[in-house]
Amino acid sequence: MVSFGGLARKIFGSSNDRRVKTLRQRAEQITALEKNYENLTDEQLQAKTAEFRAALAEGKSLDSLLPDAFATAREAAKRVLGMRPFDVQLIGGMVLHERGIAEMRTGEGKTLMATLPVYLNALEGKGVHVVTVNDYLATRDAETMGRLYNFLGLTVGVIKHGLDDDERRAAYACDITYGTNNELGFDYLRDNMKYERAQMVQRPHNYAIVDEVDSILIDEARTPLIISGPLEDRSDFYNLIDTFIPPLAEEDYEVDEKQKTAIFTEVGTEKVEKLLEAAGHLKGESLYDIENVAVVHHLNNALRAHKLFQRDKDYIVRNDEIVIIDEFTGRMMPGRRYSEGLHQALEAKEHVTIQPENQTLASITFQNYFRMYNKLSGMTGTAATEAEEFGNIYGLEVLEIPTNLPVQRIDEDDEVYRTVEEKYRAIVRDIRASHEKGQPILVGTTSIEKSEQLAERLRREGIKGFQVLNARYHEQEAYIIAQAGVPGAVTIATNMAGRGTDIQLGGNLEMRVRQELSDVPEGPEREEKIAAIKADIAQLKEKALAAGGLYVLATERHESRRIDNQLRGRSGRQGDPGRSKFFLSLQDDLMRIFGSDRMDGMLQKLGLKEDEAIVHPWINKALEKAQKKVEARNFEIRKNLLKYDDVMNDQRKVIFEQRLEMMDEEDLTETVAEMRHEVIEDMVILRIPKDAYAEKWDIAGLKQDIASKLNLDLPVEEWAKEEGIAEEEFENRIKEAADKAAAEKAERFGPQIMTYVEKSVIMQSLDNLWREHLVNLDHLRSVVGFRGYAQRDPLNEYKTEAFELFQTMLANLREVVISQLMRVEIVGEAPPEPQLPPMAGLHIDGTTGENDFDEAIWAEHQHDDRIVPPAQRDPADPRTWGKVSRNEPCPCGSGKKYKHCHGAFE
């Protein structure tokens, strides 16, 4: 029976079809201009940029310039890159310009498509950011597409790990800036820890195109970017808490594998309360008293470490360290640590050295970072399954872009086996059969561990010449994945590895030229060798096509349909044939968690024998249903997290805006006077409550407050004896005395020095209190969920208490600032420049989950991001230097710039 909605779609087309139809008409208008642009000389084509900018200056809109700007960029691409954007790429480019997400199949040319809206929007001169998932892709795309932009008179910069502030500032000042989501986010956080606007590197956030948008805005949405600094060593406390968990019985806690939670039952809570009391760590009467917030937090972490995290699945122990394994890619992530004490709980569990916990100095989620852009768009091969989330959270509409040629890939039904062993035997048989007939095979696994297990099986079976993709550097990874289309190639890779690099049947010309001819200079010999490589690739492509094209063989389903679709999408690019198939077992995680017991019983009744598979569309539908459930749950988690993060985000905006205002202020006299008066008002109302009798006044306390907060000795006892004096008179007299003392100090210092001192004190105090506030919010967040048991809404409780904490922080700020300013005196030497605290930022690759810092250096020198004052550096010991700017004199005293001295060895 056909539903009414289905019938309507057949007659009128889906909303996606109708939108594509409208955009196709506009693409045809651009194509109609092609002949005119082909007739222009290079100089005339290049002059178009100035012409468009002049039109914008006269008030024309970007939309009105779109047809001509796209036609210009298309013609320039033909001349400079030898590539002509198809009409479907024009359609995708329009979607990106109109704040949408273009879902474009793998191999259809997303990178080239992006040049069209990038060129158009860069004409405004406000900056366009093209965001990729790793440094390799950012550099590659900036170099390749930079030729096109430079030809058209636009400047291009690239942000990558290892650049100093001057280099970053120059890259952000360009018309177009390529960079990773991590680098852009960290630069924003670092900028808002600087003390002068001139030190900042980023411009206002204008327009961003996010490549692999699903990976960045969905997969990484739960992981905030964090800049942190070390706290004191608390390893004894972690070890003590860890001893409480192993003796617990099953009735002491509840574990929900689906929800990934572990909580103490009432019985368990009583047990750990007694243990804490015996150890002298229980404050108050109950574990859940407010004084025990931090203890509860660490107990919950210890329980999660033991009951939710499995060794060799979620992490491995290597060289006396816990190394996290990424859940999406199965990759090890050296250098990355869980925050909020969870990593220390795992270290205590495995009895390795407990590293000091880090304090959050600044943090932001990708959700809130990218929502700062005036205009945001994205592109990916898989977004339709998450269209609702993109719409709800980012206001982005997903549009599926039709392929230039029909997709010929055959997606076969899943094969389901009863055990993992049976499944792997079938996989090896299938790989052997396809390999022997010369068909290239990409084998997708969910973890590095499983990749290695499969590789070992293939070795035992005598299958040789396969590649296992766990390269540490993205460039090597890109080369291996690019050659996965060679006839007979067997490439084992984790699901997301090598994303951003095409698998072309026969091999990748550009990669082979780079690999084989890197030392051959330009000239006839090089051209001859390139022609030979081209001919070889064409021949290999014919063989691969004859064998059926690329075969994507997946060894397990991921809990997200989107990750599965990404893997399938590696095959069948640009109309090539191909096939894909998933091999599953009832012991796989997804099957085990989502009702495989019932299915196992059914298969036994059907009399399924060993090594026999069940293949049926019903199985695919059942799995898809399970995946939809997981996706819906994950969406709810991310949506809920965003609601909590929005509370912090609103406060973050206030603090960062205040810092910017402070940087720009040339005279802070009025601001400081306001703060001083508010401190005095709070002080008086505390000690002399409104309308209270004189006997209730705390005059001794008021005198003490005036001395400690204002550094003044005032005769308040005498004032209190005066007839008819009220709190208002106290206020006015204290304000007058404090204002007079402040004015005298300002006169002694001089306006310039006074403003400098005020600015330094306010900003450093603000930063210190904000960091403490972030820790308080973390602890509040970790325990507020328990309010649900008392029938109170945890989110509302969090909002209320977070606001109270924020108000308290601002009151403390006023007191700290005024107390310091009323005491500060100038000594002979100039006051030191404000220094950033010791800090480190982890830069995690968006696709593979690896740390993009040089791992060896990062492991040995975790303090490299510290800003160390020159006076504290030992010329003979580079470990004391911290972060040194490339153009700074080398701290060793040689007189050379750092980059030409010790920096040359990095």
Swiss-Prot record:
Where is it localised? Cell inner membrane; Cytoplasm
Gene Ontology molecular function: any one? ATP binding
- Provide a GO biological process annotation: intracellular protein transmembrane transport
**Where mainly located?**
membrane
Essential cofactor(s): Zn(2+)
Q: Which residues of this UniProt protein bind ATP?
A: 89, 107-111, 502
Q: Which NCBIfam families match?
A: PRK12904.1 (NF009538), secA (TIGR00963)
Quaternary structure note = Monomer and homodimer. Part of the essential Sec protein translocation apparatus which comprises SecA, SecYEG and auxiliary proteins SecDF-YajC and YidC.
What protein name is recorded for this chain? Protein translocase subunit SecA
Native organism:
Brucella canis (strain ATCC 23365 / NCTC 10854 / RM-666)
